[in-house]
């Protein structure tokens, strides 16, 4: 099984962004694991959430490694994820026109600011509005904090009951998460 020690390195722009994808379903989940999956916003199969890596997130991901997979997200994959699967309230797609209302020129500009740490979170918490900093919103109101994905094209390469390092699909997979997400978009 691969160690999670490799995720300590700094990201391309200074922050390490991880994506978590729930692989297994809803049956036979212990209450503790189910609670952690809910906190990670992985409430159903093939949903994806994006986080800035911290010790608490790392511990939560470690506790759900039998139900989900995760790894470092690249800039290009995050852009594709927001463009093709990003949704706002009302299940409308996230567009550049919507971002322009909040001062952002494009998804690429928002992602670059997020990776550099200029934007703390991509979405606003419920009941919170964005703070305007230099004419740009600190978060995008109405953006859903999870992404609904398809099953991967071509299927899974391994068993969904084994860890990634043992020929399966679960647990930490490093940069290979980008390939999986692109197949699921």
UniProtKB/Swiss-Prot annotation:
GO BP: maturation of LSU-rRNA from tricistronic rRNA transcript (SSU-rRNA, 5.8S rRNA, LSU-rRNA); translation
Alphabetized UniProt keyword annotations: Ribonucleoprotein, Ribosomal protein
Keyword Nucleus found: no
One GO cellular component term: cytosolic large ribosomal subunit
Pfam family, one: Ribosomal_L30
Coiled coil: none
HAMAP family reported for this sequence: Ribosomal_uL30_A
Subunit structure: Part of the 50S ribosomal subunit.
Protein name listed in UniProt: Large ribosomal subunit protein uL30
Species classification: Archaea, Thermoproteota, Thermoprotei, Thermoproteales, Thermoproteaceae
